[in-house]
Amino acid sequence: MKEQTEIEFYELEKVRFITKDACGLDIAYAYEDLVFAEHGLFIIQFPNEGGKVLNCWFNKDCIELNRVNMFNSLAKSATLNGMEISYNGKFEMIQKDGLEEIDIKFDDMN
């Protein structure tokens, strides 16, 4: 007998709306629990099972003032749409040599 795996459903459309409403940006890519904003400015990560707060990571190259303003807009829009978002730190995209793949290095604030 095969073991059934539970499928995790995320509120991608709500995150898409929050991102567009707050920053005027579209979603460039979504993979598993990660949602990448246009231009790689930030990543929103859906919480682990049972969690209620979205995690937000900004590109390490994003200017501090822009990061603060965008996060404040995201937090306000998330609240207005019944969600919460927390700033978790910065990330860096690293191109793998000779491959069309990237690694993502998260720099946690904790």
Pin down the residues of each PLM region.
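Terminal, regulation- and interaction-focused segments at domain boundaries
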Residues: 1-17, 58
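Alpha-helical scaffold elements within enzyme catalytic domains, especially in hydrolases
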Residues: 17-18, 77
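A generic structural signal for short, non-catalytic loop/turn and secondary-structure boundary residues
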Residues: 20, 37, 49, 97-99
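Short secondary-structure junctions
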Residues: 21-30, 81-90
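Short linear loop/turn motifs
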Residues: 29-38
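Long, continuous compositionally biased terminal/linker segments
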Residues: 37-81, 105-110
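Glycine-rich, aromatic-bearing surface loops/beta-hairpins
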Residues: 88-110
